[in-house]
């Protein structure tokens, strides 16, 4: 295992924007808590990149949702899986941490385990084995050494289902509780010129390009219907930069011009 005289090498694999946010927080926490330097490699997005990760490829290559979107990009996704496995095996990190997105990250973990069984593999964010397909928990033991859970009941669920050892590490929203409670909506309302005494519709198309492509049409139909009935005059859409253009184009003909907000706005 890694000695303290050389950097700890952690290979991280995220599969979408939420995983990128979790990975970035994990990187910051490890850098703050460990008494040795840390080197990161693997797959991530802008937030992980800002903390020193040079991703093997853009996260948008694999951040897709829905069977049709997956089928259209399947050759690229498969090639990215194998490229990630090849990189991990070649680099021989001290640990691999897969982050959520089990359809993508678990495919990578299984192949790393087959090719290089000595590399420890940690799964950050438990699949919802307690809700459906519980047999996954026991199968995970073949390629996951430890699970870091966001929900407090998940360690016991894994124990009962025969899954890997599991530790509750907390949910990111809990870490931001004080910030959430301190939020003052007035500055944003004033900046967007919102009428506080009127209903505000928040539209949530997600961060994946495939989600935006699939959802904006029914969202637009809903907004038109609500507007025609006099129920909606103000719309807010949280966006991430790489899908902002798609959302702007999709909402250009809406009867209500939505306010697009990014980050912690």
Predicted features along the sequence, with ranges:
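Donor-nucleotide binding loops and adjacent catalytic segments primarily
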Residues: 36, 45, 197-198, 210-265
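Charged active-site motifs of nucleotide-sugar-dependent glycosyltransferases
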Residues: 7-9, 195-202, 234
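Active-site and donor-binding regions of nucleotide-sugar-utilizing enzymes
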Residues: 8-190, 204-212, 240-242, 261-262
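Glycine-centered helix-boundary capping/hinge motifs
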Residues: 162-163, 193-195, 255
